[in-house]
Swiss-Prot record:
Keywords: Leucine-rich repeat, Repeat. Residues 1-21 are annotated as: Disordered. One of its GO terms (cellular component) is cytoplasm. The lineage of its organism: Eukaryota, Metazoa, Chordata, Craniata, Vertebrata. LRR repeats lie at residues 83-104, 106-127, 129-151, 152-173, 175-196, 198-219, 221-242, 244-265, 266-287, 290-311, 313-335, 336-357, 429-450, 453-475, 476-497, 499-520, 522-543, 546-567, 569-590. This is Leucine-rich repeat-containing protein 40.
Length: 605
């Protein structure tokens, strides 16, 4: 007869070694049993607040089935268990790890990411076989020096913690290949990282770094360095010696100039957007023979050098939201360029419709714009048969009219456009008219004859004092250049130009911002610098939802209304050279984003 009462339970021989019952129930016996065979245990997302003792002692204690199965001929050979090499405890509610972790010396992979752990146990030094350690998304503020004993560690993920420093002992992880310390509170990086000569991937993004150690240049095997979203004002020259580097991310810092990278012949991607870089010179480009991606958005570049053509392998170039006014023709010679981003630049001289057609059409346009060698004296004296000669000895290029659909009569100092010019274009659907740099006092009346086809008109550098109704009938017009004239107002009839995307009115006589511009729905660019404008209407400007570039430099603006900060579509706002006191020059120097943020902060609440 049994000595236990009917329905009673035998005493548990492992009592005192088990975790609380609710934690043990979260780890089914079958999982532990399977882990002894496979050497792998995944306990992620089980709501654990602590790790059951049975997990730490999985390879120490005799399993319960040993007391039930003594058949050495059975298939379930509990004594042939495998050491635990992989333990995943991710996405639980753990606040600490037990020192009993030392009972798992065979661990190769330990993943405890997405918990609430504030520190690591000193016993982690016993995990000398560990190759991958993921402690990301926790609350760790400091790393123990015991980590230096993990001499086989290859991948160390620490992102999204609260680290304020990396210990010098980090340099002892001699075969480390991947180190991610992004999204912490690091203000500096120990010079000992220079000892990590086997590192391939180093992520320092989203910290508070103001400088990088010179020793970082010793990482000769590093392929990817990410320093995005820090406070870096410069990059150590030693970076130029990281000869294996393929990807360099320096976005969202405080860089005012690009580092010279003469030896980075393997560099494929350079990301330096959202900085304060003002110049890009040939010294920055001449040795980057493998570069395929160059990202320079949201900087203060005014000039793109012709040496950009040195980057023969370039596939993507992002120059959006800079201060670039023109593009070098050599840009058209890049054979592999597939994506060119230019939004938010005050570009002049290139029709908006060409920009809208995409990268390939723009490159084709630039390539076709390359200057041919000057004609010899004999060629000039005997123009080719493809030209039509007017009585004034001026030449109209018939090829341009027939093939490029362009009618040019510029730089002639003419007060009138000869009738023969219009007659030559009578049978062609002209899309572009250029009568700039003459002495015209009014818009030529016969321009209306092209109303069904023309979308780009350049009448800049003349003496025109008013816009005629004939010009207002060019309903397909997308680009209008009236710079350097004598205009003081625009007619309300211009509201009919609903397709107009870009207008240049700089160097005229405007004392008021033309009201009619507020009514043109597709305007993206307004360049109206160097006039005498005294005020603007931010409410009306906010309604211009496509307006991305507004140049109001060198006017008479005594104040900038805070509500202008609500014009969220603006990507390039230029206000320099006006007599207002605020925003101050230091704010203006930071660029459009900073200006708009400042203005919004001044809106009364």
């Amino acid at each position: 007869m049994s000595r236990f009462k009917r329905g009673g339970k035998a005493p548990d021989p492992l009592s005192g070694f088990r975790a609380p019952k609710e934690q043990e129930s979260a780890v089914p016996f079958g999982l532990i049993k399977a882990a002894r065979k496979s050497g792998q245990l995944n306990l992620s997302a089980r709501g654990l607040t602590e790790v059951p003792v049975s997990v730490w002692r999985i390879n120490v204690d005799t399993p319960p089935e040993a007391h039930q199965n003594v058949d050495f001929g059975g298939s379930d050979r509990w004594w042939e268990q495998t050491d635990l090499t992989k333990l995943i405890l991710a996405s639980n509610k753990l606040q600490a790890l037990s020192e009993d972790i030392s009972l798992l010396p065979a661990l190769v992979v330990l993943d405890i990411h997405d918990n609430q752990i504030a520190s690591l146990p000193c016993a982690i030094r016993e995990l000398t076989n560990l190759q991958k350690l993921n402690i990301s998304h926790n609350k760790i503020k400091q790393l123990p020096n015991e980590l230096q004993h993990l001499q086989n560690l290859k991948s160390f993920l620490l992102q999204h913690n609260q680290l304020e420093e990396l210990p010098d002992s980090i340099g002892h992880l001699s075969i480390l290949e991947e180190l991610d310390v992004s999204n912490n509170c690091l203000r500096s990086v120990s010079s000992s990282v220079g000892q990590l000569t086997g590192l391939v991937k180093f992520n320092l993004s989203s910290n508070k770094l103001t400088a990088l150690p010179t020793e970082i240049g010793k990482m000769k095997n590093l392929r990817q360095l990410d320093c995005t979203s820090n406070l870096l004002e410069n990059v150590p020259a030693s970076v130029a010696g990281m000869e294996s580097l393929e990807q360099l991310y320096l976005r969202q810092n405080k860089l005012t100039y690009l580092p010279e990278l003469p030896f980075l012949t393997k560099l494929k991607e350079l990301h330096v957007g959202n900085n304060q870089i003002q110049t890009l010179g040939p010294e920055h480009l001449q040795n980057l023979s493998s570069l395929s991606v160059l990202e320079l958005r949201y900087n203060k570049l005014k000039v793109l050098p012709k040496e950009i053509s040195l980057l023969k392998g370039l596939e993507r170039l992002d120059l959006s939201n800079n201060d670039i006014g023109s593009l070098p023709d050599t840009l058209g010679s890049l054979p592999n360029l597939k994506s060119l981003q230019l939004d938010g630049n005050p570009l002049r001289g290139i029709r908006r419709d060409i920009l809208n057609k995409g990268t390939q059409e723009l490159l084709k346009y630039l390539k076709g714009r390359v200057q041919t060698p000057d004609m010899t004296t004999q060629e000039a004296a005997n123009p080719p048969d493809t030209a039509m000669t007017l009585p004034s000895d001026s030449v109209i290029n018939a090829h341009a009219i027939m093939t490029l659909k362009t009618l040019e009569y510029c730089e002639k100092q003419a007060s009138l456009i000869p009738e023969a010019v219009f007659n030559a274009a009578a049978s062609s659907p002209i899309t572009t008219v250029n009568f700039s740099k003459n002495q015209l006092t009014e818009v030529p009346a016969r321009i209306v004859e092209m109303k069904d086809s023309v979308y780009d008109v350049n009448l800049g550098f003349n003496k025109i004092s008013s816009i005629s109704l004939n010009l207002c009938m060019l309903l397909k017009l997308t680009h209008l250049d009236m710079r350097n004239n004598a205009l003081a107002s625009l007619p309300p009839e211009m509201e009919a130009l609903t397709r107009l995307q870009s207008i240049i009115l700089s160097f005229n006589r405007f004392k008021h911002f033309p009201d009619v511009l507020y009514t043109i729905p597709n305007l993206e660019t307004i360049l109206i610098s160097s006039n005498q404008i005294g005020s603007i209407d931010p409410i009306q400007l906010k309604k211009m939802t496509k307006l991305s570039t507004l140049d109001l430099q060198n006017n008479d603006l005594l104040q900038i209304p805070p509500a202008l900060g609500n014009c969220e579509s603006l990507r390039a706002l230029h206000l320099e050279g006006n007599p207002f006191r605020n925003p101050r020059a230091t704010i203006l120097a930071k660029g459009t984003v900073a200006i708009l943020e400042y203005l919004r902060s001044r809106i009364p609440t």
